[in-house]
C-alpha cells in the first residue's frame, strides 16, 4: 500500500473516562459532604449554585459547581454557623461566597423562619441602588430562602436589609470588611 493510500481496515476507538459526578449531590459527596439537605439548586450558564444545610446542625452553606458535558465538579463553598442566633438577633441569616477565578460572581443567600420576611435588599458601598432578593419556598417544605448573585458584587463590605411585604424593616445587618454588625430588630414585634 502506498504512503497516501487509504486503508479501510483501520478502526479508531475514542473512549472517555468520566471521573466527574452525574448530579450535584454526587459532586458534593465526592467533595466529602455526604449528608446534605439541598435547599435550592440554581443552574446558571456558568455553573450550578447549591444552597444546602447539614441536618441537625445550626448552619447553612453555599457551593459552586462546574457543570459541563463530563458532569459536575465541586469548585468552592462557604459555611455560615449559628444561623438561628443570627436570625434571632438581626431578623435574618445569610451565607456569602466570594467571587474568584473559578466563581464568576459573589453570591449572597439566606434562610429564614420569619414568615413576614418578604424581600432582602443587598447593598454594597459601590452601588447607588440595592439588589432585591425575594424570599421563596425552598426544596424543603416550610423552609423559606433568598438568593442574590452578581459579578458586580465584591463581598468586601455590604448591608443586608430584610423587608416585610409592606416595606417595613424586619432584619438588618452589615459587614464592613472586617466586622459584622447586627442591628437588633425585635422580630416578635413584626409578627
Predicted features by range, described:
Residues 82-109, 180-190:
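Extracellular ectodomain segments of secreted/surface proteins
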Residues 52-54, 112, 149-152:
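Short beta-strand-to-loop capping motifs
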Residues 58-61, 104-107, 132, 156-157:
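Short, surface-exposed coil-to-beta transition loops
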Residues 44-48, 104, 142:
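Short acidic/glycine-enriched loop/turn segments that link adjacent beta-strands
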Residues 1-88:
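Long, contiguous interaction/targeting segments characteristic
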Residues 109-116:
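Structural motif
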Residues 33, 119-190:
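Ser/Thr-rich low-complexity repeats and stalk/linker segments
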Residues 36-42, 93-99, 134-136:
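Short amphipathic beta-strand and strand-loop transition segments with alternating hydrophobic
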